[in-house]
Amino acid sequence: MRDIAKLNENDKKALFHNTAAKMGMTDAIIEKDFWVCYMLDYLFHRCAWKNNIAFKGGTSLSKSYGLIERFSEDIDLILDWRVLGYEKDEPWADRSNTKQDAFNKEAGAKTEAFLRNEFMPAVITDLQSELSYDVNCYIEDDDPQTVVFAYNRSFDDSAILPVIRLEIGALAAWTPAEKKPITPYAAEQYGRLFKQPSTDILTVLPKRTFWEKVTILHREAYRPENSALPTRYSRHYYDLYCMANSPVKAEAFADLDLLDKVVCFKDKFYRCSWARYDEAKPGTMKLIPSEKNIKVLKDDYEHMKNMIYGEKPDFDVILNAVKQLEDEINTL
């Protein structure tokens, strides 16, 4: 991928444009997809912390497993907390709620300092050496655990951000995970132009992501009326709809211990007073939000649909499938 990254702008522009025409996507999406894959290749093969990270989240569902047909713009990474100076099992030590909250805040602050003082400067140095131009990487004040890479772009699209966000957190679980190949759309169409059309990335298994999404929806089902729903949250309902219509559902259903681990992890490191994680289990799982938030999610989904490049199911169809999934989980 480095050879393509170093092409002159006109050649890259032609490659992305021709790929977009073949795939029925916008030029800007094809371009950004390439840079997402390039960045993953760098992070997992040439970055100093290549052995201390794992890939998770929505982008992994589309790029590593082909489970969703949604263009996901961000790269979610798990950072080994030992990089921050913790022992392997230290975060799991028994603590009071107050002390656990203090530990979680401390781990967050250490992550922010690491990203600001060590990780981002190293990434800038490495990428400037590879790309031979001044690389624009930065951390936004209101999101200190996200490193932003503003790639040199040839196309504009108001529907997507012209940057790649590396969302990096240490308080996340690595297992189960496996190495999976990812391929840019441009390499799928014009593989002969690439010396390296794909790259192997350590990726969290989708059955864990399935339970992560289920517990997100369970929490949202209990969101208080006076608490605003985050933007772009309809993506979790779409993603779960897709996974529920794939073999991943059976794999997840066969591993209820993994659901327990996901719930325990969230309750310890992402405590939420109203989430009712103790009820996130067969028999008491709840996945359907309030009527008020259904309306909010429908509107959110309408704004997100242009990021779906495959079938675009109505949100009512998605909710019906989620309700069916809720019933299935509660009879396990």
Tell me what each language-model feature is.
Residues 62:
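Betabetaalpha-Me/HNH-type nuclease active-site subdomain
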